Amino acid sequence: MAFKKRFTPRRKFCRFCADKDLPINYKRPDILRDFVTERGKIIARRITGTCAHHQRLLTTEIKRARQMALLFYTSTHSSDVLKKSSL
């Protein structure tokens, strides 16, 4: 009788705890884009692996970057969709 090995997922770690020099700042949208889906939703910490403290900071900075128009609320705007459908 063959026994199946149990799958043990790799332990997720917080990128910001591991690298203290990596800033969480609204002025760095290239870093913030890693934590936002294509549709503009903020990815949960159980998926990204960030700790609770840094997840709270990430959420506020992503929202701040959206208000400053450094990040989009969604990936495509409704005007782009209307242009494509009219062609």
UniProtKB/Swiss-Prot annotation:
Upper classification of the organism: Bacteria, Pseudomonadati, Thermodesulfobacteriota, Desulfovibrionia, Desulfovibrionales
Record GO biological process: translation
Protein name: Small ribosomal subunit protein bS18
Similarity comment: Belongs to the bacterial ribosomal protein bS18 family.
Assembly and binders: Part of the 30S ribosomal subunit. Forms a tight heterodimer with protein bS6.
Entry GO MF terms: small ribosomal subunit rRNA binding; structural constituent of ribosome
NCBIfam families in UniProt: S18 (TIGR00165)
GO CC, any one term: cytosolic small ribosomal subunit
Gene name for this UniProt entry: rpsR
Keywords: Ribonucleoprotein, Ribosomal protein, RNA-binding, rRNA-binding
Pfam families: Ribosomal_S18
Function in brief: Binds as a heterodimer with protein bS6 to the central domain of the 16S rRNA, where it helps stabilize the platform of the 30S subunit.
